[in-house]
Amino acid sequence: ECHHVSSVSFEQVLRQVTATFVYGLTATPIRTDGHQPIIFMQCGKIRFTSDAKSQMENQGFKRLLIPRFTSFRSITSDRKTYVQITQELSEDKVRNEFVMEDVKAAIQKGRTPLVLTTRTAHVKVLAQMLMPFADHVIQLIGADSAKEKRLALQNLQSIPISESLVIVATGKYVGEGFDYPRLDTLFLTMPIAWKGNVEQYAGRLHREYEGKSEVCIYDYVDIRVPLCDSMYRKRLKGYIKAGYGKNVTSPAPDKNSQELIYERNNYEAAFRNDLAKAKHSVVIAVPKVKFKYKPSIMSALANLLHDGVPVVVHVKEEGANELELSNAGMDVVCNKEQTLQCAIIDKSIVWYGNINFFGYNSETNNVMRIADYKIANEMMEILYSATENKVNEKSYTLPI
């Protein structure tokens, strides 16, 4: 865990070390506080990186990401802090039951889940709810004493494989130094944004273990809460880096298609393919329509309009190229309160992330393809309810 070198106490120790060579190992060389130059100063530059692709080639199990979109919404329109939001999420009974149904199903399938949250009180609530459904429910929280932590780990090692087990813990407890190879399913019940945390938590599942054929991450996305929606879009990058970008399965029972996480350099062909198959409608939501040259999808959308398929574009910030879209025959609606970024095709396929289909995208932008009509309709409801409730919305129409 050499990323700790940038802390004052560790740096002071290393300044006194007279070793000829200093070796550092870490899963997260980039720190959220930006102090990684101190790591490189004390340990030298990165000499070797083992990426997810090479690791997966040497392992016998698949990595699956299962996004779970919740129905949670705040009862007030006030802007809340992250702490206030997580408290509301942890106390929401419907949301907790939604998570529990997934965990119970995993236990019944013989899986060994790790349920992660950011709040100690939430650990206790979830553990209590799980007591009737597993032989062993282990709680691990950062506030435990060293003795309690040692006893908990000893207890884990003594549990036979024939007995069901679920671990409920805070992210800080299992973030580093926690090793229990039996784990194969992660439930990320609270929003996080930093990709380093995603990789760190996912790493808890990547230990070799006899009989392990796949590892799954259930990620709970509260798309009706703008901060949670934004944080999910940010952590998609972490999933790609951890090897979860190529094998994503839909939680919908009636869908067998495979979804993928795409980046800016590889999404267009697949997206245009979905557009070409559209029969009924296309709805696109972007923060801004701004381009110097016409985006490549304009021709695909023009073909749809020619065939009588309506195309609606929702825009958060107006004042750029909206009129060009209107002149092409698209309906353009501007709403400053819009938060979603997505494309919804035939109310059944969703492209959701932070890719702007009508603007510039950086190398960190990405998008997830989800074939699920329930999620599609949920996003339609969010988009159109926001539009209908906004008094100062503006629609662009062709001049007569």
What role is predicted for each listed range?
Residues 1-5, 172-174, 190-191, 205:
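Conserved Walker B
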Residues 3-64, 239:
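Post-DEXD/H (motif II) to motif III coupling segment of the RecA-like Helicase ATP-binding lobe
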Residues 26-29, 193-217, 235-236:
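Conserved SF2 helicase motif VI
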Residues 74-77, 84, 209-254:
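C-terminal helicase lobe
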Residues 77-118, 124-129:
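Conserved interdomain hinge at the start of the Helicase C-terminal
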Residues 114, 124-125, 134-175:
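Conserved helicase ATPase core of P-loop NTP-dependent helicases/translocases
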Residues 167-168, 176-191, 200, 216-219, ...:
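A short beta-strand element within the Helicase C-terminal
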Residues 253-400:
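PLD/PLD-like phosphodiesterase catalytic module centered on the HKD motif
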